[in-house]
Amino acid sequence: MKKEIWGFYPPPIGGISIYCKRLAEKLHAIDESVIMRDFAQSGYESECVMRVKNRILEFLKLPFVPKRLIHAQFTNFYLLMMLYLFGWKHDIVLTLHNRRIVLLDGWKRKVVNQLFRRAKYIIYNDPAYTALLREKYDIDSGKIVLLPTYMAPEQSEVKGLTTELEEFINKHEYSISSNAHRVINNVFGDLYGIDQLIDLMNRLVNEKGLDVGMVFCIADIFDHEYYDKCVARIEELGLTEHFCFAVNSPVNGFEVWAHTDLFVRATMSDMEGV
């Protein structure tokens, strides 16, 4: 039986895509029959990564191909729905990387509930998530597997800092770093706590008189309107020289953290990678 990881290979660079990359490469090194189908359409291909050129067609083919084990890393409802509609022939394993699923209601929740019933295993990374999931969905406890979704980086991933980042960090007496996959301001507020970090820097620099630099790595701005508001707030507080937004930077987040004095993850989202 074929064994496939269905997810997103970087770019875009984010916690889930980096995890998928490392998982696919490590499992393929153990068992060459394990491959990853990349739904990110990044254009990257290797002996263990197969690019999905047409997402819809990939799902439509499922009833007509030999049975396989599919380990899905999706959080997008519509991809989960397609897997439910066309993946009935196959063994399904789901990894839930965040709590977005518990926010679904109505017919969407019913679809996901049916997918959960069909799945062989449901992997998640937060013990506190159990109660939330079982409150919303009819899940057999025997299917639930607690497994941290973190894999340490390989030495081959180390690239070094850009000259711009290195100079910014070195010119300040103290340095703090943080990161976000995207700039998101939703019903829960600022998901990655940029507003809190601005307030923190205001207290440290303007109220306490400390020379601190903040490096904030962002893979994708996404919400440009909110991002512009954050930048305007930084300018208003006179903190422009103390903030560096590394947007879509080729530098690895873990290397930035290693070169700064403190890493802060001001978020309500999952943070096992820290």
Residue ranges and their predicted role:
Residues 4, 165-192, 198-201:
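Conserved donor-binding/catalytic core segment of Leloir-type glycosyltransferases
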Residues 39-42, 179, 212-228:
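Glycosyltransferase donor-sugar binding loop
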Residues 60, 88, 99-124:
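Membrane-proximal helix-turn-helix segments that form the acceptor-binding/catalytic region
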Residues 72-80, 96-99:
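Short His-centered aromatic/hydrophobic patch
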Residues 117-135, 139-163, 170-173, 179-180:
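Donor nucleotide-sugar binding/catalytic pocket of nucleotide-sugar-dependent glycosyltransferases
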Residues 215-220, 227-249:
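Nucleotide-activated donor-binding/catalytic signature segment of Leloir-type glycosyltransferases, i.e.
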Residues 242, 258-272:
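Acidic donor-binding loop of glycosyltransferase active sites
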Residues 248-250, 255-260:
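Short alpha-helical donor nucleotide-sugar binding micro-motif in glycosyltransferases
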